[in-house]
Swiss-Prot record:
This is Small ribosomal subunit protein uS13. It comes from the Bacteria. Residues 93-127 are annotated as: Disordered. Transmembrane segments: none annotated. One of its GO terms (biological process) is translation. Located at the top of the head of the 30S subunit, it contacts several helices of the 16S rRNA. In the 70S ribosome it contacts the 23S rRNA (bridge B1a) and protein L5 of the 50S subunit (bridge B1b), connecting the 2 subunits; these bridges are implicated in subunit movement. Contacts the tRNAs in the A and P-sites. The keyword Ribosomal protein applies. GO terms for molecular function: rRNA binding; structural constituent of ribosome; tRNA binding. Gene3D superfamilies: 1.10.8.50, 30s ribosomal protein s13, domain 2.
Amino acid sequence: MARIAGVDIPRNKKIEIAITYIYGIGRSNGMEILRKANVNPERRVRDLTEEEVGRIREIVDREYRVEGDLRREVQLNIKRLMDIGCYRGLRHRRGMPVRGQRTRTNARTRRGRRGQAIGIKKKATKK
C-alpha cells in the first residue's frame, strides 16, 4: 500500500479513485494532482513507481490542506460560529439543521431520535 498524507491508499484500485480516500481530496482535486504529478489516472496503485508516489505525496503536502489539518480547521470554524453566537452557531449548538431545512418533519439525521412515540404493548396473558 502506498502511504500519502498518513493514509494507506488501496493497492488494487485505479489511482484516480484511490487518491480520494484522503480526507479533503475529491475526484476533481485528485485529477488535478495527478495531472501536476504527470501520472496516468488509469494506472493501478500497485503499478506506480516509488518516484511517482513521491511526486504525488509532495504535491499533496505542499498545495493541499488534508486529513487532520482540514478536520481541525472545520472544527475551529464551527466553534467560532458558536462562540460569536450567530444563527448558524446556535443551530450547531442545538444540533439542528444549519442550512435552512425544515424541521417540523424530517431532519432525523441531524436531530437524532427525540421523543419517539412509544407503541402500545399487549398485556401479558395469564397461563
